[in-house]
Swiss-Prot record:
Transmembrane segments: none
Cofactor binding annotation: Binds 1 [4Fe-4S] cluster per subunit.
One of the GO biological process terms: 'de novo' NAD biosynthetic process from L-aspartate
Function summary: Catalyzes the condensation of iminoaspartate with dihydroxyacetone phosphate to form quinolinate.
Organism expressing this protein natively: Chlorobium phaeobacteroides (strain DSM 266 / SMG 266 / 2430)
UniProtKB keywords: 4Fe-4S, Cytoplasm, Iron, Iron-sulfur, Metal-binding, Pyridine nucleotide biosynthesis, Transferase
Positions of [4Fe-4S] cluster binding: C101, C187, C280
Protein family according to the UniProt entry: Belongs to the quinolinate synthase family. Type 2 subfamily.
Protein name from the UniProt record: Quinolinate synthase
Length: 323
């Protein structure tokens, strides 16, 4: 097992081209009064040109509180859509409109509406990794950073529908000791980590602490020294005395972990050989070339119909208030 090397290696010619594009993006940001928001799972060269790099909660807050005229969102579709819901009067751009989220897509609006109708008295809390249509059916939205905090504020006698991620929901149920009605969606990246492979990595690296995202399966979480959101995992690696970590989440975060703690070792958790999908290919669809082109063309633009936007905004605002 080897540590993650920083960053993804490029040739001298590729680095020069990236540097030239980064310079052009910087000029366009000034001309357009634009802010570039990027998720930790995007490529290092995207993170390097972003004004804000963060997890879903940090990026939602950054989308809410900025003075830019244009928001360029390097992430997946629901993130840019959320930024547009919060900022209806701003131009919101996305480098690749087809960078979707299979977790969000695993919750079809018709099926979820029927699920909700079967439990009319339930409070509906949905993960931010969901479509605007699903948010419009929800009472509160949450992220992996604040889900536990929000659910602790709900009276225990109140029935909760939680979706679409069953693993995050199951983790919260176990931690808080309360039942919830779970939608059976999952993130394919985190679902790819399996107990046998994780334990093998721990045996090969006995000095390393296993840290894991709560979207992982319970069979992985039970072995983790620390469980937390992407931001919480990052913060933990900075403050923890350990010098080596096996990281069970999308490996894009290892770039920032290594940048903040250059003397520490970060090992990307191994994936199940029969399910080799522990990298989010949708996040990696955001390239520097696409970022530059979308700013130059002012397209593709995120558009959310106003009637849908108003309904989807309510649970987002509730989340930000409760956080």
């Amino acid at each position: 097992m080897t540590s993650y090397s920083l960053p993804f290696k490029s040739s001298g010619k590729e680095m020069a081209a990236s540097g030239e594009l980064a310079g052009k993006i910087g000029l366009l940001k000034k001309e357009m009064n634009a802010i570039v928001l990027a998720h930790y799972y995007t490529l290092p060269e995207i993170q390097q040109v972003a004004d804000v790099v963060g997890d879903s909660l940090a990026l939602a807050r950054a989308a809410e509180k900025n003075s830019a005229d244009v928001i360029v969102f390097a992430g997946v579709y629901f993130m840019a859509e959320t930024a547009k819901i919060i900022n209806p009067d701003k131009l919101v751009l996305m480098p690749d409109l087809y960078a979707g989220c299979p977790l969000a897509d695993s919750c079809p609006v018709g099926e979820f509406r029927a699920f909700k109708q079967r439990h009319p008295d339930a409070l509906v809390i949905t993960y931010i990794n969901s479509t605007a249509e699903i948010k419009s059916l929800s009472d509160i939205t949450c992220t992996s950073s604040n889900a536990e905090h929000i659910i602790r504020q709900i009276p225990e006698e109140r029935t909760i529908i939680f979706g679409p991620d069953r693993n995050l929901g199951g983790y919260i149920m176990k931690k808080l000791g309360r039942e919830m009605l779970l939608w059976q969606g999952f993130c394919y990246v985190h679902e790819a980590f399996r107990e046998a492979c994780i334990l093998q990595a721990c045996r090969e690296n006995p000095q390393a602490e296993l840290i894991a995202h709560p979207e992982c399966r319970e069979e992985v979480l039970r072995h983790a020294a620390f469980i937390g959101s992407t931001q919480a995992l990052l913060d933990y690696t900075v403050s923890a005395p350990a010098s080596s970590f096996i990281v069970a989440t999308e490996p894009g975060i290892l770039y920032e972990m290594q940048r903040r703690s250059p003397k520490k070792q970060f090992i990307a958790a191994p994936k199940d050989p029969e399910n080799p999908r522990s990298v989010c290919k949708q996040m990696k669809q955001n390239t520097l070339e696409k970022l530059y082109q979308c700013m130059l063309d002012r397209s593709p633009e995120i558009i959310v119909p106003d009637d849908l936007r108003v309904l989807a905004l309510r649970p987002i605002k509730k989340m930000l208030e409760m956080s």
